[in-house]
Regions:
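Generic structural signal for well-ordered, non-membrane alpha-helical segments
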Residues: 2, 6-9, 32-36, 40, ...
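N-terminal capping segment at the start of a domain
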Residues: 6-34, 138
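Predominant activation on well-ordered alpha-helical scaffold segments within soluble catalytic domains
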Residues: 10, 14, 41-44, 153-161, ...
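Structural signal for hydrophobic packing residues in well-ordered secondary-structure cores
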Residues: 17, 21, 47, 51, ...
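A non-catalytic alpha/beta surface segment that caps or lines the substrate-entry region
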Residues: 28-77, 81-83, 87
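Active-site metal-coordination/substrate-binding segment of hydrolases
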Residues: 73-173, 178
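Midchain, well-structured core segments that form catalytic/ion-binding scaffolds
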Residues: 128-129, 134-147, 181-285
Length: 285
Protein backbone atom coordinates (compact mmCIF):
# COMPACT_ATOMS: atom_id res chain seq x y z
CA UNK A 1 0.00 0.00 0.00
CA UNK A 2 1.25 3.48 -0.86
CA UNK A 3 2.73 5.32 2.11
CA UNK A 4 0.14 8.10 1.97
CA UNK A 5 -2.42 5.75 3.52
CA UNK A 6 -0.28 4.66 6.47
CA UNK A 7 -1.00 7.57 8.86
CA UNK A 8 -4.77 7.13 8.56
CA UNK A 9 -4.54 3.36 8.88
CA UNK A 10 -2.36 3.60 11.98
CA UNK A 11 -4.54 6.25 13.62
CA UNK A 12 -7.70 4.23 13.06
CA UNK A 13 -6.15 0.94 14.10
CA UNK A 14 -4.58 2.26 17.31
CA UNK A 15 -7.87 3.92 18.24
CA UNK A 16 -10.06 0.90 17.47
CA UNK A 17 -7.97 -1.63 19.40
CA UNK A 18 -8.46 0.41 22.57
CA UNK A 19 -12.19 -0.36 22.46
CA UNK A 20 -12.94 -3.64 24.26
CA UNK A 21 -15.06 -5.87 22.00
CA UNK A 22 -14.43 -9.35 23.40
CA UNK A 23 -17.08 -11.88 22.36
CA UNK A 24 -18.71 -14.36 24.77
CA UNK A 25 -19.40 -17.87 23.51
CA UNK A 26 -21.74 -18.58 26.45
CA UNK A 27 -24.11 -15.73 25.60
CA UNK A 28 -27.22 -16.37 23.47
CA UNK A 29 -27.61 -12.73 22.42
CA UNK A 30 -26.48 -11.18 19.16
CA UNK A 31 -24.04 -9.56 19.48
CA UNK A 32 -22.92 -11.81 22.31
CA UNK A 33 -21.63 -8.82 24.31
CA UNK A 34 -23.15 -5.34 24.50
CA UNK A 35 -19.70 -3.76 24.44
CA UNK A 36 -19.29 -4.72 20.79
CA UNK A 37 -21.78 -1.93 20.12
CA UNK A 38 -19.20 0.56 21.40
CA UNK A 39 -17.23 0.01 18.21
CA UNK A 40 -20.18 -0.80 15.94
CA UNK A 41 -21.91 2.48 16.83
CA UNK A 42 -18.66 4.41 16.35
CA UNK A 43 -18.14 2.90 12.90
CA UNK A 44 -21.69 3.81 11.88
CA UNK A 45 -21.08 7.39 13.04
CA UNK A 46 -17.79 7.57 11.13
CA UNK A 47 -19.35 6.16 7.96
CA UNK A 48 -22.04 8.83 8.13
CA UNK A 49 -19.40 11.49 8.76
CA UNK A 50 -17.36 10.58 5.66
CA UNK A 51 -20.47 10.58 3.47
CA UNK A 52 -21.43 6.92 3.06
CA UNK A 53 -25.04 6.16 2.12
CA UNK A 54 -27.65 3.83 3.62
CA UNK A 55 -25.76 3.51 6.92
CA UNK A 56 -27.57 1.30 9.40
CA UNK A 57 -27.06 -1.21 12.18
CA UNK A 58 -29.15 -4.36 11.85
CA UNK A 59 -30.96 -5.93 14.77
CA UNK A 60 -28.31 -8.69 14.77
CA UNK A 61 -25.50 -6.17 15.16
CA UNK A 62 -24.03 -5.73 11.68
CA UNK A 63 -23.12 -2.29 10.36
CA UNK A 64 -24.01 -1.83 6.69
CA UNK A 65 -23.29 1.07 4.35
CA UNK A 66 -23.07 1.90 0.65
CA UNK A 67 -20.43 3.74 -1.36
CA UNK A 68 -22.20 4.70 -4.59
CA UNK A 69 -20.46 3.90 -7.85
CA UNK A 70 -18.56 6.59 -9.74
CA UNK A 71 -17.85 6.92 -13.45
CA UNK A 72 -19.64 6.24 -16.75
CA UNK A 73 -19.44 2.46 -16.36
CA UNK A 74 -20.42 2.28 -12.69
CA UNK A 75 -24.01 1.25 -13.44
CA UNK A 76 -22.76 -1.85 -15.29
CA UNK A 77 -20.32 -2.95 -12.60
CA UNK A 78 -21.15 -5.63 -10.03
CA UNK A 79 -21.69 -4.61 -6.43
CA UNK A 80 -18.67 -5.63 -4.35
CA UNK A 81 -18.77 -5.87 -0.56
CA UNK A 82 -15.89 -5.64 1.91
CA UNK A 83 -16.31 -7.06 5.40
CA UNK A 84 -14.42 -7.16 8.69
CA UNK A 85 -15.40 -8.27 12.18
CA UNK A 86 -15.20 -6.11 15.29
CA UNK A 87 -15.10 -8.76 18.03
CA UNK A 88 -12.02 -10.25 19.65
CA UNK A 89 -11.44 -13.75 20.94
CA UNK A 90 -12.99 -14.72 24.29
CA UNK A 91 -10.76 -15.79 27.13
CA UNK A 92 -8.10 -13.14 26.57
CA UNK A 93 -8.62 -9.65 27.92
CA UNK A 94 -9.39 -6.92 25.43
CA UNK A 95 -9.84 -4.25 28.11
CA UNK A 96 -7.22 -1.59 28.69
CA UNK A 97 -5.26 -2.32 25.51
CA UNK A 98 -2.14 -0.15 25.27
CA UNK A 99 -0.84 -0.38 21.70
CA UNK A 100 2.91 0.02 21.29
CA UNK A 101 4.18 1.41 17.97
CA UNK A 102 7.75 0.25 17.27
CA UNK A 103 9.07 2.56 14.56
CA UNK A 104 11.35 1.35 11.76
CA UNK A 105 11.82 -2.18 13.07
CA UNK A 106 15.51 -3.05 12.90
CA UNK A 107 15.22 -6.77 13.58
CA UNK A 108 15.65 -8.78 16.73
CA UNK A 109 13.31 -9.05 19.70
CA UNK A 110 10.63 -6.50 20.53
CA UNK A 111 10.00 -5.80 24.23
CA UNK A 112 6.53 -5.79 25.76
CA UNK A 113 6.69 -3.22 28.58
CA UNK A 114 4.05 -4.77 30.83
CA UNK A 115 5.48 -8.28 30.48
CA UNK A 116 9.28 -7.93 30.46
CA UNK A 117 9.66 -11.69 30.64
CA UNK A 118 8.05 -11.94 27.18
CA UNK A 119 9.78 -11.04 23.93
CA UNK A 120 8.35 -10.98 20.44
CA UNK A 121 11.12 -12.25 18.20
CA UNK A 122 11.68 -13.77 14.74
CA UNK A 123 12.48 -17.06 16.47
CA UNK A 124 8.95 -17.35 17.86
CA UNK A 125 7.21 -15.26 15.17
CA UNK A 126 9.03 -15.96 11.86
CA UNK A 127 7.03 -13.34 9.92
CA UNK A 128 8.85 -10.63 11.86
CA UNK A 129 12.00 -11.37 9.87
CA UNK A 130 10.21 -10.10 6.74
CA UNK A 131 9.23 -6.79 8.37
CA UNK A 132 12.59 -5.08 8.88
CA UNK A 133 12.10 -1.38 8.15
CA UNK A 134 8.39 -1.46 8.86
CA UNK A 135 6.57 0.07 11.82
CA UNK A 136 5.29 -2.74 14.06
CA UNK A 137 2.34 -2.41 16.45
CA UNK A 138 2.16 -4.74 19.45
CA UNK A 139 0.21 -4.92 22.69
CA UNK A 140 1.86 -3.99 25.97
CA UNK A 141 2.03 -7.59 27.16
CA UNK A 142 -0.92 -7.42 29.57
CA UNK A 143 -3.69 -7.91 26.98
CA UNK A 144 -4.27 -9.06 23.46
CA UNK A 145 -3.82 -6.44 20.74
CA UNK A 146 -6.98 -7.18 18.78
CA UNK A 147 -5.39 -6.98 15.35
CA UNK A 148 -7.77 -9.80 14.45
CA UNK A 149 -9.72 -8.15 13.06
CA UNK A 150 -9.35 -4.47 13.81
CA UNK A 151 -6.65 -4.38 11.15
CA UNK A 152 -9.40 -5.30 8.71
CA UNK A 153 -11.77 -2.74 10.21
CA UNK A 154 -9.19 0.03 9.82
CA UNK A 155 -8.43 -0.98 6.22
CA UNK A 156 -12.10 -1.07 5.17
CA UNK A 157 -12.77 2.31 6.80
CA UNK A 158 -9.71 3.90 5.15
CA UNK A 159 -10.72 2.40 1.80
CA UNK A 160 -14.25 3.78 2.17
CA UNK A 161 -12.88 7.21 2.98
CA UNK A 162 -10.61 7.16 -0.08
CA UNK A 163 -13.32 5.97 -2.48
CA UNK A 164 -15.74 8.62 -1.26
CA UNK A 165 -13.28 11.50 -1.56
CA UNK A 166 -11.02 10.66 -4.51
CA UNK A 167 -12.84 11.58 -7.73
CA UNK A 168 -10.05 10.04 -9.81
CA UNK A 169 -11.06 6.51 -8.79
CA UNK A 170 -13.87 5.07 -10.91
CA UNK A 171 -15.62 2.08 -9.37
CA UNK A 172 -18.88 0.23 -9.16
CA UNK A 173 -21.17 0.20 -6.12
CA UNK A 174 -19.37 -0.86 -2.95
CA UNK A 175 -20.98 -2.22 0.19
CA UNK A 176 -19.26 -2.02 3.57
CA UNK A 177 -20.09 -4.40 6.39
CA UNK A 178 -18.80 -4.83 9.94
CA UNK A 179 -20.01 -7.89 11.85
CA UNK A 180 -19.92 -9.09 15.46
CA UNK A 181 -19.11 -12.51 16.93
CA UNK A 182 -16.90 -13.98 14.20
CA UNK A 183 -14.54 -15.39 16.83
CA UNK A 184 -17.31 -17.58 18.25
CA UNK A 185 -18.56 -18.82 14.89
CA UNK A 186 -21.60 -16.56 14.67
CA UNK A 187 -20.30 -13.79 12.43
CA UNK A 188 -22.66 -14.39 9.51
CA UNK A 189 -26.28 -14.14 10.53
CA UNK A 190 -28.63 -16.04 8.16
CA UNK A 191 -30.13 -12.68 7.16
CA UNK A 192 -26.81 -11.07 6.27
CA UNK A 193 -26.40 -12.28 2.64
CA UNK A 194 -29.75 -10.74 1.65
CA UNK A 195 -29.07 -7.55 3.60
CA UNK A 196 -25.62 -7.22 2.05
CA UNK A 197 -27.05 -6.94 -1.48
CA UNK A 198 -23.71 -7.66 -3.16
CA UNK A 199 -22.68 -9.79 -6.12
CA UNK A 200 -19.38 -10.73 -4.52
CA UNK A 201 -17.82 -10.11 -1.11
CA UNK A 202 -14.34 -10.11 0.38
CA UNK A 203 -13.48 -10.38 4.06
CA UNK A 204 -10.39 -8.49 5.25
CA UNK A 205 -9.16 -10.83 7.98
CA UNK A 206 -5.55 -11.98 7.99
CA UNK A 207 -3.11 -13.13 5.35
CA UNK A 208 -0.30 -11.47 3.47
CA UNK A 209 -0.90 -8.46 1.19
CA UNK A 210 -2.10 -9.61 -2.21
CA UNK A 211 -3.30 -13.03 -1.02
CA UNK A 212 -6.92 -14.10 -1.48
CA UNK A 213 -8.29 -17.11 0.38
CA UNK A 214 -11.24 -18.60 -1.50
CA UNK A 215 -12.10 -21.44 0.86
CA UNK A 216 -13.54 -21.29 4.34
CA UNK A 217 -12.68 -23.15 7.50
CA UNK A 218 -15.53 -25.39 8.62
CA UNK A 219 -16.01 -27.03 11.99
CA UNK A 220 -18.55 -28.81 14.15
CA UNK A 221 -18.79 -28.15 17.87
CA UNK A 222 -19.63 -30.69 20.54
CA UNK A 223 -20.07 -30.26 24.29
CA UNK A 224 -19.35 -33.43 26.27
CA UNK A 225 -21.24 -33.41 29.58
CA UNK A 226 -20.14 -35.75 32.34
CA UNK A 227 -22.23 -36.30 35.47
CA UNK A 228 -20.30 -37.95 38.25
CA UNK A 229 -21.32 -39.16 41.68
CA UNK A 230 -20.09 -36.90 44.45
CA UNK A 231 -19.94 -38.19 48.00
CA UNK A 232 -18.11 -37.24 51.16
CA UNK A 233 -14.45 -38.02 50.61
CA UNK A 234 -14.26 -39.79 53.96
CA UNK A 235 -16.77 -42.41 52.85
CA UNK A 236 -16.19 -42.33 49.09
CA UNK A 237 -14.69 -45.79 48.55
CA UNK A 238 -16.60 -47.69 45.87
CA UNK A 239 -19.15 -44.87 45.68
CA UNK A 240 -17.58 -41.72 44.25
CA UNK A 241 -17.36 -41.30 40.49
CA UNK A 242 -15.20 -38.23 39.86
CA UNK A 243 -16.37 -36.32 36.78
CA UNK A 244 -12.99 -34.61 36.43
CA UNK A 245 -11.20 -37.97 36.34
CA UNK A 246 -13.56 -39.15 33.62
CA UNK A 247 -12.97 -35.93 31.67
CA UNK A 248 -9.23 -36.54 31.82
CA UNK A 249 -9.75 -40.09 30.54
CA UNK A 250 -11.82 -38.81 27.62
CA UNK A 251 -9.05 -36.39 26.66
CA UNK A 252 -6.39 -39.07 27.03
CA UNK A 253 -7.95 -41.30 24.37
CA UNK A 254 -8.14 -38.57 21.73
CA UNK A 255 -5.53 -38.87 18.93
CA UNK A 256 -3.17 -36.30 20.41
CA UNK A 257 -0.17 -37.17 18.22
CA UNK A 258 -1.97 -36.90 14.88
CA UNK A 259 -5.20 -34.90 15.07
CA UNK A 260 -4.57 -31.76 17.10
CA UNK A 261 -4.04 -28.22 15.77
CA UNK A 262 -0.37 -28.37 16.73
CA UNK A 263 0.22 -31.58 14.73
CA UNK A 264 -1.74 -30.78 11.54
CA UNK A 265 -1.66 -28.23 8.74
CA UNK A 266 -3.21 -27.45 5.37
CA UNK A 267 -6.51 -29.22 4.88
CA UNK A 268 -5.94 -31.80 7.59
CA UNK A 269 -8.74 -32.02 10.09
CA UNK A 270 -8.20 -31.88 13.83
CA UNK A 271 -9.90 -32.21 17.19
CA UNK A 272 -9.37 -29.24 19.49
CA UNK A 273 -10.34 -29.23 23.15
CA UNK A 274 -10.22 -25.58 24.17
CA UNK A 275 -12.00 -25.59 27.53
CA UNK A 276 -12.66 -27.95 30.44
CA UNK A 277 -14.78 -26.76 33.34
CA UNK A 278 -16.31 -28.57 36.27
CA UNK A 279 -15.89 -30.30 39.59
CA UNK A 280 -16.12 -33.81 40.97
CA UNK A 281 -19.87 -33.93 40.41
CA UNK A 282 -20.12 -32.40 36.95
CA UNK A 283 -17.73 -31.56 34.14
CA UNK A 284 -17.98 -30.24 30.60
CA UNK A 285 -15.47 -30.55 27.76
Amino acid sequence: MHNKYVPELEERFVRYVQIDTMADDTSPSSPSTAKQYDLLNLLAEELNAIGASDVRITDYGAVLATIPGRGPRAHRAPTVAFLAHVDTIPGFSGAGVKPQVHRNYAGGALPLPEAPELLLSPETSPNLAKKVGYDIVTASGATILGADDKCGVAIVMAMANELLHNPAIEHGPVRVCFTPDEEIGRGVDPRLPADLMANVAYTLDGGEPGAIVFESFSADKAVVTIDGVSTHTGTAKDQMVNALTLAAKVLSVLPQATLTPETTDGRQGFIHCYKVVGNAAHAEI
